[in-house]
Amino acid sequence: MKRTFQPSNIKRKRSHGFRTRMATKNGRNVLARRRAKGRSSLSA
């Protein structure tokens, strides 16, 4: 049986990257929450 997690940096960046987050209002909300929480890394 094939495992569910098949890592790919391109897919990772496209779905969870900074520019993808900035592209939508909800994505910007995510970044704002992570900044407020004090995350050292905001996005993938």
From Swiss-Prot:
GO terms for cellular component: ribonucleoprotein complex; ribosome. The lineage of its organism: Bacteria, Pseudomonadati, Pseudomonadota, Gammaproteobacteria, Alteromonadales. Residues 1-44 are annotated as: Disordered. The keyword Ribonucleoprotein applies. PROSITE patterns: RIBOSOMAL_L34. This is Large ribosomal subunit protein bL34. Residues 10-19 have a biased composition (Basic residues). It comes from the Bacteria. Pfam families: Ribosomal_L34. GO terms for biological process: translation. Belongs to the bacterial ribosomal protein bL34 family. HAMAP family: Ribosomal_bL34. GO terms for molecular function: structural constituent of ribosome. PANTHER family: LARGE RIBOSOMAL SUBUNIT PROTEIN BL34M, MITOCHONDRIAL RIBOSOMAL PROTEIN 34 FAMILY MEMBER. Keywords: Ribonucleoprotein, Ribosomal protein.
